[in-house]
Amino acid sequence: MKGGESKAEATSTDQRLKTRGRKAGKKTKKDPNQPKRPPSAFFVFLEDFRKEFNLANPNNKSVATVGKAAGARWKAMTDEDKAPYVAKAESRKTEYIKNVQQYNLKLASGTNREEDDSDKSKSEVDEAVSEEEAEDDD
């Protein structure tokens, strides 16, 4: 073993690392209706820069090259040059905050019918429906 560790010490370290992290496959699913976070000023700049860069370099397929060139230009820009991108990012941020508030109100009011059924498994819902149909036939 490396570093003078015994085999028992190595396995106990592995066990500690396994128990600390989250279990694989237990990710919580994100709501597709949840508003996306707004881009920062740099990413607003990057949207415009990509268009210019792709027109100037149509054969470039490397995302890294575009990112490096954009980063270099962003660092070279003055605060006055960055101001329109910062303003646009701020406006998107305020719009995002409004959207999140509306989204949270919608969740709190419980207008989402899908959430009401999510507590029951599909088989429980199907059984309840079939029992209701059987009662209606009588």
Curated annotation (Swiss-Prot):
The gene is HMGB4. PANTHER family: HIGH MOBILITY GROUP B PROTEIN 4-RELATED. This is High mobility group B protein 4. One of its GO terms (molecular function) is chromatin binding. Mostly expressed roots and flowers, and, to a lower extent, in stems and leaves. It comes from Arabidopsis thaliana. GO terms for cellular component: chromatin; cytoplasm; cytosol; nucleus. Induction: Up-regulated by cold stress. Residues 18-29 have a biased composition (Basic residues).
